[in-house]
Regions:
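Charged, amphipathic alpha-helical regulatory modules used
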Residues: 2-119, 123, 480
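Catalytic-loop motifs flanking and including active-site residues across diverse enzymes
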Residues: 28, 32, 238, 420, ...
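Buried hydrophobic packing segments
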Residues: 32, 36, 242, 246, ...
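Core structural elements
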Residues: 79-85, 289-290, 472-496
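Conserved catalytic cores of very large enzyme subunits
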Residues: 105-482, 503, 509-681
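Well-ordered alpha-helical scaffold segments within catalytic/enzyme domains
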Residues: 495-503
C-alpha cells in the first residue's frame, strides 16, 4: 500500500462514520486500534504495539481519502484489510476477512428472521406503519395474516431469490422493488371476450361455469373472475372494451334501462366488497370504448356457444345503456352515498367521441363531482384504439421499439400487464453526483441494470411457479408471460434537479426541465437495450410509489441530513416521477403545457392529475376542460381531480372542509333554540 505523502498540513480525520442502518456516528480511531489488536492476538502475529502502528497507518489513509468526511463502515474495514495485507500480516488479514464474512452472513440471516411476537403485537396495537399504508385494506384478522405473511415473503425475495447486491440496493434505498410481500406478478389485463365466450372453468378440482347466456350471469362471472385472479396477482386486474363486449346481452334479451342498471349495481357493489386476501377490496379497472372500435365493428358476438344475428358495430344504443347505467350507479354511491372506489373507469376518447351527447353530459357531471374516470387520449397521442387487443396477436414483436402497455396506470390491455416494478431513487443520485451529469447517468445506468436483473429473476420464478400450478387460474387464462412487461420507474426527478444544482434549479425551470428530459431519454435507451438483450418486453412507468417516495426520503435523510426534499423533516417525501412540485400551479393548462413532453416519454403507466381546489362548476365546464386537454396536448392519460369532503351525516360536500358546515349550522340552530326556550321559561 502506498502511504500518502506527508504535507505541511495533514488531512483532517473523518468526522463521522455511516453505519449499516444509515445512521451517522462519531469517528473513533480507538475502535480501529482495538479491532486490529484483537485480530493480531487471535493469530499470534503481533501485539498491541504493532497494532497501534497499523491503526495509525489505516487512519492516515482514511484521512487522505475522506478528510473531514464520513466513510461507510464497510469502507473503513476495507482500508483495515488493505493495511494488514500491505504489512504482510497475511494470516491476520485472512482471519479478518473470514470474520467479516461470518458477520455479514449472520446479519443476513437475522434479516430473514421475523420476530413473531413483535410482528403480531405491532399490528394489533397499530404500531406498524403498514397497518394504514393501504387505503383498500382495513384493520382486520385478514389484514393481520397478510401483514405477517408479507414480511416473511419479502425476506424470502431479498435474501433467497435475488442476488445480494440487488437485496442490498433495495434495503439501502437506491431502488425500490415493489410488492415484495407477494410471491406473484404485478398487474394483468384479461380478455373479457374470452371469459364471456368460454366461461369461468378449466381448473381441475374447482367448480366450473359454462359461458353466460344472460347479463346477470355474465356479471356474476366477471365478479368471480376478477376476485379470483386478484388472489394470484399483487396489483390491478383489468378488462378492456367492457361496454362493447357486454352490449350483445342487452340486445339478445331486449333489456330495458332498469334491468341494465340493476346488473351494473350488482357488479359494482360486489367488486367493492373486501373479498381479496387480507380483507382488501379487489383492485379492478374497466375500460370503456364508448364508441365501438373499428376493428370490432364487423365481428359477430357469440353468446352461450351461438353466433348472434348482429355485429358489435350494430350495438351503439346498447352500449349507451350500459354507459348510462354504470355512470348512474357510480355517481349515486352506496346505501349511505359513499362513492365507490372500484372498478376504476377508463374512457377511450377517440376522434368520433360524441362530446355533446346526453351520456357525455352524465360522464362529465360525474367527473366534475368526484373525478373518478381516467381519460385515454386516442385523439392526439401515440396511442391507437386497437393497441388494447394487439398484444395478444402480434407474433413478431419488434424489440427495438418501446411498446406502450395500454390502458394507463392501473389498467392493462388484453392479455398483457406487468411482471414487476422497480423504481429508482433519482433524488439520491442528484445529491451524490451534484454538478456531474456524466457520473449521475453512469450511476443511474448501474441501478437500471440491477433493476433489470431483478425483473428477469422474477419473470423466471413466476413462470416456473405458474407451470407448477401455484397460479391455477392465471395458468388457465394466460399460460405464459410472453406479453407481460418488465417495468422500471423513476421517482423524485424534481428533487434530483434541486440537489444536483444545490437548490438553484428545479423541474419547473427551463434548465431543470431539459435535464429531466435527458434523463428520461437515457432510461428509454437503456431499457431498449434490455429488450434486445433479454427478448422480453420492458417499459418505463411513472410509478405511483406512494410508499416508496416516503421510504426513499427517510432513508436519505438518515444518511445526508442536508439533502433537499419535499414535505417536512418529520414527514419527508419526494415528488412522484417527473411531476411538478405539489401546489406549484392551480392552472390546469399550465400543468399540461409543462408536463406534455415529459409525460409522453413514459411507455407504461402514467397519468397527469388536473387538481381542482373544489368541484368544477358544471358538466359543460368539465367537458370543455377535458376536450381542450386531449385535443391540444399529446398526453396519453389525464384525470380530473376535484377536492371534496364526505360527512358521515350529510354525505358529499364540495371543496375541503375539516368540519361539516351543515352539521355546525344544525348545532348552532339547536343551541339557539335551547337558549330561546330557556329565556321563554324564565319569562313565564
Amino acid at each position: 500500500m502506498t502511504t500518502p505523502t506527508p504535507s505541511a498540513a495533514a488531512p483532517a480525520m473523518p468526522a463521522a462514520v455511516i453505519q449499516r442502518d444509515g445512521q451517522r456516528a462519531v469517528f473513533d480511531a480507538c475502535r480501529i486500534r482495538s479491532a486490529i489488536a484483537r485480530a493480531g492476538a487471535a493469530t499470534g502475529e503481533f501485539g498491541d504495539t504493532q497494532a497501534a502502528l497499523l491503526a495509525d497507518e489505516a487512519c492516515r489513509v482514511l484521512a487522505y481519502r475522506w478528510p473531514g468526511g464520513a466513510p461507510h463502515i464497510e469502507q473503513i474495514q476495507d482500508v483495515v484489510e488493505q493495511t494488514l495485507v500491505a504489512a504482510r500480516h497475511m494470516a491476520t488479514a485472512r482471519a479478518y476477512m473470514a470474520y467479516r464474512q461470518r458477520r455479514a452472513t449472520l446479519r443476513a440471516d437475522a434479516q430473514t428472521l421475523v420476530d413473531v411476537q413483535s410482528s403480531i403485537n405491532e399490528y394489533l396495537t397499530r404500531a406498524d406503519w403498514r397497518v394504514n399504508a393501504n387505503a383498500n385494506q382495513g384493520y382486520s384478522l385478514g389484514g393481520l395474516i397478510l401483514n405477517v405473511a408479507g414480511k416473511v415473503t419479502a425476506n424470502y425475495w431479498l435474501s433467497h431469490v435475488y442476488a445480494p447486491e440487488i437485496g442490498q440496493a433495495h434495503r439501502e434505498g437506491d431502488i425500490h422493488i415493489h410488492d415484495l410481500d407477494m410471491l406473484s406478478g404485478y398487474c394483468a389485463g384479461w380478455s373479457l371476450r374470452t371469459l364471456l365466450t368460454e366461461g369461468l372453468n378449466g381448473v381441475p378440482g374447482k367448480v366450473e361455469a359454462a359461458p353466460p347466456k344472460h347479463m346477470s350471469s355474465a356479471v356474476g362471472q366477471i365478479v368471480n373472475f376478477l376476485g379470483t385472479l386478484q388472489n394470484e396477482w399483487a396489483g390491478a386486474q383489468a378488462f378492456s372494451s367492457f361496454d362493447t363486449y357486454m352490449a350483445p346481452f342487452v340486445r339478445k334479451d331486449g333489456m330495458d334501462y332498469a334491468a341494465v342498471r340493476q346488473c351494473m349495481q350488482e357488479m359494482i357493489y360486489n367488486l367493492n366488497v373486501p373479498s381479496r386476501w387480507g380483507t382488501q377490496t379487489p383492485f379492478t379497472n374497466l375500460t370503456f370504448d364508448w364508441v365501438c372500435p373499428e376493428d370490432l365493428r364487423e365481428q359477430v358476438p357469440v353468446i352461450g356457444g351461438e353466433e348472434m344475428p348482429f355485429a358489435y358495430g350494430d350495438l351503439q344504443a346498447e352500449m349507451d345503456l350500459i354507459n348510462r347505467a354504470y355512470i348512474d350507479v357510480m355517481t349515486t354511491g352506496d346505501a349511505k352515498g359513499r362513492v365507490f372506489t372500484f372498478p376504476i373507469p377508463t374512457y377511450n376518447i377517440t376522434p368520433d367521441f360524441p362530446w355533446e351527447s346526453e351520456n357525455a353530459g352524465r360522464l362529465f357531471a360525474m367527473t366534475a363531482k368526484y373525478g373518478l374516470p381516467y381519460f385515454q387520449n386516442f385523439i392526439n397521442s401515440e396511442l391507437k384504439p386497437n393497441m388494447v387487443r394487439s398484444m395478444c396477436c402480434r407474433l413478431q414483436l419488434d424489440l427495438r421499439e418501446l411498446l406502450k402497455r395500454g390502458n394507463g396506470l392501473f389498467g392493462s390491455a388484453e392479455q398483457t400487464g406487468s411482471v414487476g416494478v422497480v423504481t429508482v431513487n433519482c433524488a439520491r443520485l442528484g445529491y451524490l453526483h451534484a454538478g456531474d451529469e456524466a457520473a449521475l447517468l453512469d450511476a443511474l445506468g448501474r441501478l437500471l441494470e440491477l433493476g433489470s436483473q431483478s425483473l428477469e429473476v422474477k419473470r423466471k420464478l413466476i413462470q416456473r411457479l405458474m407451470d407448477q400450478g401455484l397460479f391455477p387460474y392465471t395458468r388457465r387464462y394466460l399460460g405464459m408471460l410472453r406479453n407481460h412487461f418488465s417495468t422500471l420507474g423513476v421517482n423524485g426527478i424534481n428533487e434530483m434537479v434541486r440537489n444536483f444544482t444545490r437548490g438553484e434549479q428545479d423541474i419547473t425551470t427551463a434548465w431543470g426541465h431539459a435535464f429531466a428530459l435527458r434523463l428520461l431519454d437515457f432510461v428509454r435507451k437503456r431499457i431498449t437495450g434490455f429488450q434486445e438483450r433479454t427478448g422480453h418486453l420492458y417499459n418505463l412507468e411513472a410509478s405511483p410509489a406512494e410508499g416508496a417516495t416516503y421510504r426513499f426520503a427517510k432513508e436519505d435523510l438518515k444518511r445526508w441530513p442536508d439533502i433537499l426534499h419535499a414535505g417536512t423533516p418529520g414527514k419527508p417525501y419526494y415528488t412522484n416521477s417527473s411531476q411538478l412540485p405539489v401546489g406549484f400551479t392551480d392552472d390546469p393548462f399550465e400543468a399540461l403545457a409543462r408536463q406534455e413532453d415529459l409525460q409522453t416519454k413514459y411507455t407504461g403507466g402514467t397519468v397527469l392529475h388536473l387538481y381542482m381546489g373544489e368541484r368544477i362548476s358544471d358538466a359543460a365546464a368539465c367537458r370543455e376542460l377535458v376536450r381542450r386537454a386531449l385535443t391540444r396536448f399529446r398526453l396519453p392519460y389525464i384525470t380530473v381531480t376535484p377536492t371534496f369532503s364526505v360527512c358521515p351525516v350529510h354525505g358529499y360536500l364540495a371543496g375541503e372542509h375539516p368540519y361539516c358546515p351543515l352539521c355546525d349550522a344544525e348545532k348552532l340552530a339547536a343551541k339557539r333554540q335551547a337558549i330561546e326556550r330557556q329565556q321563554q321559561a324564565r319569562a313565564a
